Curated annotation (Swiss-Prot):
PANTHER family: SAGA-ASSOCIATED FACTOR 29. The record marks Y205, Y212 as: Histone H3K4me3 binding. Residues 121-255 form the SGF29 C-terminal domain. Keywords: Chromatin regulator, Nucleus, Phosphoprotein, Transcription, Transcription regulation. Residues 163-165, 207-210 are annotated as: Histone H3K4me3 N-terminus binding. It is found in: Nucleus. Belongs to the SGF29 family. CDD domains: Tudor_SGF29_rpt1, Tudor_SGF29_rpt2. It comes from Saccharomyces cerevisiae (strain ATCC 204508 / S288c). Residues 75-102 are annotated as: Disordered. GO terms for biological process: chromatin organization; positive regulation of transcription by RNA polymerase II; protein localization; regulation of transcription by RNA polymerase II; SAGA complex localization to transcription regulatory region. This is SAGA complex subunit SGF29. Chromatin reader component of the transcription coactivator SAGA complex. SAGA acts as a general cofactor required for essentially all RNA polymerase II transcription. At the promoters, SAGA is required for transcription pre-initiation complex (PIC) recruitment. It influences RNA polymerase II transcriptional activity through different activities such as TBP interaction (via core/TAF module) and promoter selectivity, interaction with transcription activators (via Tra1/SPT module), and chromatin modification through histone acetylation (via HAT module) and deubiquitination (via DUB module).
């Protein structure tokens, strides 16, 4: 569920940024213009402005559709979990009810991480876990995308994950079938060790759900990583990324999860 909420927050930030670049509000001065007295170049300039404004508004409409979709999924998932809990309470005996009252809860299938190191704890992968998924193309340190685990199958080494971002047409994100070598677990929030400067990592680029190779420049007091992403157009540009969204590079990981 956290993955859906992260997408909602990220989408709302995208809408805010879109308004900062090209305000959604109508320009009063534009309404007062007399287009009949303008030259062809002036008309073309205004036409370009209107087209950019329209494209920006249409893009925001698609983002809002995605927000509504993710909020709906969150609400449905919450209802399903509540329904399952009520069913369990009705079917289980007094002993199970006592266990539940003490905070004990049955756990479904548990997935196992393949990639692990001192900078990315070997925590179990569960339904709802956030992961970085590598599409089956390119190198291990190519682009990875943030997904949410929908299903743990087989013996915990295969998964179904969903891209929470809609496609270019605004349709729901794709569902992928993958194995544990194609996933990197995003730490669920517990403390993680800081990377030393010079460490090669995969980090989620701000305002996207895509992970790219980067080099750690340093770490701030709050744990935020200062990074230099590979391929940045601006030379020596530093970017700050939340620690939990900075993952060890698969090619640099020394410890592999045991079967």
């Amino acid at each position: 569920m956290d993955g859906y909420w992260d997408v909602v927050v990220s989408s709302l930030q995208d809408i805010y940024n879109a308004n900062e670049v090209i305000p959604f509000d109508d320009e009063l001065q534009t309404k007062k213009l007399n287009f009949l007295n303008m030259s062809k170049d002036q008309l073309q300039l205004h036409l370009n402005t209107f087209q950019e404004h329209m494209e920006n508004v249409n893009r925001v409409h698609r983002i809002l559709d995605n927000v509504r979709s993710n909020l709906s999924l969150m609400l449905n998932q919450s209802r399903e979990e509540k329904s399952e809990e009520n069913t369990e309470d009705a079917e289980e005996g007094e002993g199970t009810r006592m266990a539940l009252s003490q905070g004990k809860k049955a756990v479904g299938k548990v997935g196992r991480s393949y990639w692990t190191s001192e900078y990315n704890p070997n925590a179990p992968i569960l339904v709802g876990s956030e992961v970085a998924y590598k599409p089956r193309r390119g190198s291990a340190d190519g682009e990875w995308i943030q997904c949410e685990v929908l299903k743990v199958v087989a013996d915990g080494t295969r998964f179904e994950v969903r891209d929470p971002e809609p496609d270019e047409l605004g349709n729901s994100g794709k569902v992928y079938k993958c194995n544990r070598k194609e996933l990197l677990l995003i730490p669920p929030g517990f403390p993680t060790k800081n990377y030393p400067p010079g460490t090669k990592v995969l980090a989620r680029y701000p305002e996207t759900t895509t992970f790219y190779p980067a080099i750690v420049i340093g770490t701030k007091r709050d744990g935020t990583c200062r990074l230099r992403f590979d391929g940045e157009e601006e030379v020596d540009k530093e970017t700050e990324v939340t620690r939990r969204l900075v993952l060890p590079s698969p090619t640099a990981l020394a410890n592999l999860a045991r079967k």
